[in-house]
């Protein structure tokens, strides 16, 4: 039985004061961590405030990015070693905004996955196709290839413990959600790809999220699908009541 994992991705929104206020508003009403994992991914500058506010609560903390080197002359980058020392649990990698705007390659993302595991954190690895790719009938092949490249060299144990987020680019921040069936279809492809690369035991363990205009009104239906174990949520994760509705999808 895979534990549900609902993660907010605040992107470049919120400041430390808003972060503290947000966590104070939700912390008493989070589901128990052993039933559903509630995670917030925040900008690096907000992580100290987030970690402080989340102490002793059922909330886990994600960074939205990190570099693949631990230290050195890499101006402006964030070290995975430092994130681990700070107490960060998850790091989101391969988000389409990072692939598109910051030109991150499959190879960069794969190196980040290795660095995150080396530093005792868990990657939330994102994949997903553009509208053009979908309309060309190549969504399955595209996503399967991203997963294959992203997981290169990772051990079966590492992959079993990680999270893969399927986020069709055309559904991000557009209000256009993939239907629950469309989301399930590609999440199943992700799981089959993991089974081919490793084996069915690993595929049965890896948790797969759907992301793209998830909101309280559609989360239950999406979470009801066989291969969907969680959500990676942008817009609807930035308001406390909405975040609580999301993490309590099965109440
Ligand atoms: O990482 C989150 C996704 O990009 C989804 O964003 P959204 O929920 O605002 O569509």
Curated annotation (Swiss-Prot):
Q: Any idea of its EC number?
A: 5.3.1.1
List the signal peptide residues. none
PANTHER family from the UniProt entry: TRIOSEPHOSPHATE ISOMERASE
Question: A biological process (GO) annotation for this entry?
Answer: gluconeogenesis
What residues bind substrate, as annotated?
A: 9-11, 173, 213, 234-235
Query: Which keywords fit this entry according to its UniProt record?
Result: Cytoplasm, Gluconeogenesis, Glycolysis, Isomerase
One GO molecular function term of this record is: triose-phosphate isomerase activity
**Annotated catalytic residues:** 95, 167
Q: Where does this chain mainly localize?
A: cytoplasm
Leading EC class: isomerase
Taxonomic source organism: Latilactobacillus sakei subsp. sakei (strain 23K)
Q: Which cysteines are joined by disulfide bonds?
A: none
Q: What this chain does, per the record? A: Involved in the gluconeogenesis. Catalyzes stereospecifically the conversion of dihydroxyacetone phosphate (DHAP) to D-glyceraldehyde-3-phosphate (G3P).
Which family does the record assign? Belongs to the triosephosphate isomerase family.
- Provide the assembly information: Homodimer.
Which PROSITE patterns does this one have? TIM_1, TIM_2
Q: Where in the cell is it found?
A: Cytoplasm
Quote the protein name from its UniProt record. Answer: Triosephosphate isomerase
A Gene Ontology term for the protein's cellular component: cytosol
Short name of one Pfam family for this protein? Answer: TIM
Q: Which reaction does it catalyse?
A: D-glyceraldehyde 3-phosphate = dihydroxyacetone phosphate
**InterPro entries found in the cross-reference section:** Aldolase_TIM, TIM_sf, TrioseP_Isoase_bac/euk, Triosephosphate_isomerase, Triosephosphate_isomerase_AS
Tell me the route in metabolism or biology where this protein functions: Carbohydrate biosynthesis; gluconeogenesis; Carbohydrate degradation; glycolysis; D-glyceraldehyde 3-phosphate from glycerone phosphate: step 1/1
């Amino acid at each position: 039985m895979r534990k549900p994992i609902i993660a907010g991705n605040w992107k470049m929104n919120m400041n430390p004061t808003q972060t503290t206020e947000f966590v104070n508003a939700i912390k008493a009403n989070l589901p128990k961590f052993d039933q559903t994992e509630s995670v917030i991914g925040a900008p690096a500058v907000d992580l100290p405030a987030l970690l402080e506010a989340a102490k002793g609560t059922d909330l886990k903390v994600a960074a939205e990015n990190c570099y693949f080197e631990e230290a050195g002359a890499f101006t402006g980058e964030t070290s995975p070693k430092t994130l681990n020392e700070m107490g960060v649990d998850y790091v989101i990698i391969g988000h389409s905004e990072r692939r598109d705007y910051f030109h991150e390659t499959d190879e960069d993302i794969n190196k980040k996955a290795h660095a995150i595991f080396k530093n005792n954190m868990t990657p939330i690895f994102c994949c997903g196709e553009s509208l053009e790719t979908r309309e060309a009938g190549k969504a399955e092949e595209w996503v399967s290839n991203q997963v294959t490249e992203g997981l290169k060299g990772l051990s079966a144990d590492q992959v079993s413990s990680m999270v893969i987020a399927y986020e069709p680019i055309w559904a991000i921040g557009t209000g256009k959600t993939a239907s629950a069936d469309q989301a399930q279809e590609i999440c199943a492809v992700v799981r089959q790809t993991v089974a081919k690369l490793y084996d069915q035991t690993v595929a049965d363990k890896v948790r797969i999220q759907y992301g793209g205009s998830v909101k309280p009104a559609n989360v239950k239906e999406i979470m009801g699908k066989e291969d969907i174990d969680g959500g990676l949520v942008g817009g609807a994760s930035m308001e406390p009541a909405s975040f609580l509705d999301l993490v309590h999808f099965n109440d």
